Every structure is written in structure tokens, then in C-alpha cells.
A protein has these predicted regions:
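Conserved nucleotide-sensing/catalytic segment adjacent to the nucleotide-binding pocket
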Residues: 24-86
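A generic structural signal for short, solvent-exposed coil/turn residues
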Residues: 17, 25, 47, 74, ...
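Glycine-rich phosphate-binding P-loop
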Residues: 1-26
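Conserved NTP phosphate-binding and transfer environment spanning the P-loop NTPase/kinase superfamily
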Residues: 79-162
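Short secondary-structure transition/capping segments
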Residues: 5, 10-13, 73-81, 160-161
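Short, low-complexity, polar/charged sequence segments that are solvent-exposed and flexible
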Residues: 11-13, 22, 45-46, 61-64, ...
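A short, sequence-level motif marking secondary-structure junctions
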Residues: 6, 48, 116-117
């Protein structure tokens, strides 16, 4: 997951929350993205920056020292982009979500904008987005709960009108 957003919006704090939940950090501010032969992108961190995360108020953290080796991942394919926003960039389809494509070198990566507001559990939303992505969300294929709900309602309403 690549987390994007303006300075100070909470990207590093979200990354720290995800690490505390058992996920691994690839890079903080300067991920190196390399396009593979199949068109997909692979993210990694330059060695001098590896293991470190800067969190406002806490300073520089050595994630490997705080959470162990499992908390650092040397490289990982880019499967999902999360964009943290102060306000929604466009109206959201409440059934399908706000999925869109993040274009990178001619390759589309599913992107999900998340509005940052007090009381939202962003780590849980990112974990759920990753699960949805694994089911094909954001690709125009795969499982879509909104479509299933619409289908069930149409079937139910159709039976009642008979």
C-alpha cells in the first residue's frame, strides 16, 4: 500500500498504526518504485532510510528496533494506493465506494481516497481496502458488495410486487 497525502495529514502516523497491527513498513517518505517486466511496480527503500519512520511529536523512530524484523519489508509489489484527503475530492458512490485509478507509467493501480476526520479508524479502513482489493475491488471486476445488495433488493422487491 502506498499512502499519499499532503504534509502533516497523518501518513506516518497511519503507517505506525498499521505496523502496530502486524503489517510491515517498506519506506517512509521516499519509496523507490521500479517497474517490472509485467508492468507492475515494486516498492523498496534506499538503505540509509530503511527502518526509519518520522512521526510528528515522536521524532525519528527505528521501526525494526521497536517492533522487530517482521515490521520491515525490503520490497513489495504496489497493489493499492491510499490517498489521505482533508475533504472529499469528488462525490462518492455510496454503494461502490470512491475507487479510481492511480496511473503510474502506463499501469493503473487501484486508488482509494480516504477523508481524514476525527474519530475515523484509518488503519481499519486501509486493512479493509486491502482485503477488498484482494477480492478484485478497484479493477471493475471481482466481488462488489454494493452490486450484490442492489441485486438482492431488486429480487426482493420483484417478488413482493407479484
Amino acid at each position: 500500500v502506498l499512502i499519499l497525502g499532503s504534509a502533516g495529514i497523518g501518513k506516518s502516523e497511519l503507517a505506525l498504526d498499521l505496523v502496530s497491527r502486524g503489517h510491515a513498513l517498506v519506506a517512509d517518505d521516499s519509496p523507490v518504485l521500479t517497474q517490472q517486466a509485467d508492468g507492475r511496480w515494486l516498492g523498496r527503500c534506499l538503505f540509509p532510510l530503511q527502518d526509519f519512520l518520522e512521526v510528528r511529536g515522536l521524532g525519528i523512530l527505528n521501526i525494526r528496533r521497536l517492533f522487530g524484523d517482521r515490521a520491515i519489508c525490503a520490497e513489495h509489489p504496489l497493489d493499492l494506493v491510499i490517498r489521505l484527503e482533508d475533504a472529499p475530492s469528488r462525490p462518492e458512490d455510496r454503494l461502490a465506494g470512491a475507487w479510481r485509478d492511480y496511473r503510474l507509467g502506463g499501469h493503473a493501480v487501484p486508488e482509494l481516497p480516504l477523508t481524514v476526520r476525527g474519530g475515523r479508524n484509518l488503519a481499519l479502513l486501509v486493512e479493509t481496502a486491502a482485503r477488498l482489493r484482494a477480492c478484485g475491488a478497484g479493477e471493475g471486476i471481482g466481488y462488489n458488495a454494493g452490486q450484490e445488495l442492489s441485486r438482492r433488493l431488486e429480487e426482493h422487491l420483484g417478488k413482493e410486487s407479484l
